[in-house]
Regions:
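Secretory targeting and sorting signals
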Residues: 1-28
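Structural preference for beta-strand elements that scaffold enzyme active sites
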Residues: 109-113, 153-157, 195-199, 226-230, ...
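Surface-exposed substrate-engagement region within the catalytic domains
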Residues: 54-82, 205-329
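Second-shell loop/turn segments in exported
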Residues: 88-93, 102, 126-135, 168-177, ...
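Sec-exported extracytoplasmic/periplasmic mature domains
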Residues: 104-108, 147-150, 187-195, 216-223, ...
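C-terminal region of N-terminal signal peptides and the immediate post-cleavage residues
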Residues: 19-43
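N-terminal carbohydrate-binding/catalytic regions of secreted carbohydrate-active enzymes
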Residues: 46-148, 152, 307-336
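Active-site cleft segment of glycoside hydrolase catalytic domains centered on the general acid/base Glu
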Residues: 131-151, 160-196, 203, 208-212
Length: 338
């Protein structure tokens, strides 16, 4: 799973010269932005949520394990994650089993939240490098992804990083035209499913700082035919900072709506830690719980897209990107209840 907060421009240039890829900026919160409301107390009941909660998630299995080991207090705290809906990131080789399991679990009563993350040349060769081997393989994957959703209610976050890496120059010029075409075709294919909403990822306000720089690339990638764009995926920017950025960007995109990843932004971003402040930063906490009741006409949902407790990569003692890290998860949950 990709980490969406990224290096400074200077670091990007250095990496580019070394042909080692590049990434978006993590940045520090500007001024005295209001901190996103954190989760307090026990996990909220799931009955009022429109989104599916996976009873077999890593967090849920960890709760069971700790309960069996007598770590009852830690298990209770971790329920702040396990009892809330988080996104599913279907496998890059075959997305069908993951999606079908989620759709079956939702049983037509909940919306499954999915992340399509398999674009060729993904993450510019960094911690979450990979993706489909070529354009046709990607289109085949997207077709299987969409077929597996069927008529179910689904919300799809389409290709975190992909457009932002076009804007920051990370994606080499020879791949840019293909990427735009693939994203556009992916939007159209997913929107053929009657119950599917699609949000094309647009990075975060500490990465692409000026909304005007990403508006036209989003248009080229097909955002007008999607349901909107997504912000803050796997990042830590506050709700207020993200909503302000999203509102400006929406104004450049004919009033497009957007979603916000609030999975780990309860304390905002880590400042003063250089280029990898985005990678497994200490002292963070869960943010606003997933909901479609956002209180903002432009914000369709607050979502936990980055699965709280999954590592950003092998930094600060973490495992590889996307790997469950129970100690980090426990810290996020515990600080949310402080």
């Amino acid at each position: 799973m990709s980490s969406r907060a990224r290096h400074s421009i200077a670091a990007v240039l250095t990496l580019a010269l070394a042909l080692a890829g590049c990434s978006g900026g993590s940045g520090s919160p500007a001024g005295d932005e209001t901190r996103a409301p954190a989760v307090r107390g026990e996990a909220a009941p799931t009955a009022g949520s429109p989104f599916w909660v996976d009873p077999q998630s890593d967090a849920a299995r960890q709760v069971e394990q700790w309960q069996s080991q007598g770590r009852t207090e830690d298990a209770k705290v971790l329920k702040r994650i396990s009892e809330r809906p988080v996104a599913d990131w279907p496998a890059g080789d075959d997305p069908v089993p993951d999606i079908r399991r989620a759709v079956k679990g939702a049983a037509g009563k909940r919306t499954v939240v999915l992340v399509a993350y398999n674009i060729p040349h993904r993450d510019c060769g960094l911690y979450s490098a990979g993706g489909a081997r070529d354009g046709q393989a990607y289109l085949d994957w997207i077709n299987s992804f969409a077929d597996a959703i069927g008529d179910a209610r689904a919300l799809v976050i389409l290709e975190p990083d992909a457009v932002s890496h076009l804007v920051d120059g990370c994606t080499p010029a020879e791949y840019q035209g293909e990427r735009n075409q693939l994203l556009s075709e992916a939007v159209d294919r997913l929107k053929r499913q009657p119950g599917t909403k699609v949000y094309l990822d647009a990075g975060n306000p500490a990465w692409i700082k000026e909304p005007s720089k990403i508006a036209e690339p989003l248009r080229t990638a097909g955002v007008a035919r999607a349901d909107g764009f997504s912000l803050n995926v796997s990042n830590f920017q506050t709700d207020e900072a993200v909503k302000a950025f999203g509102t400006q960007l929406s104004g450049l995109l004919d009033g497009a709506h957007f979603t916000v990843d609030t999975s780990r932004n309860g304390e905002g971003p880590l400042s003063g830690e250089g280029d990898e402040s985005w990678c497994n930063p200490p002292g963070r906490s869960l943010g606003t719980p997933p909901t479609a009741e956002t209180g903002d006409a432009l914000v369709d949902a607050f979502l936990w897209i980055k699965r709280p407790g999954d590592s950003d990569g092998p930094c600060r003692g973490g495992p590889s990107a996307g790997t469950w890290w129970p100690d980090y998860a426990l810290g996020l949950a515990r600080r949310a209840g402080a």
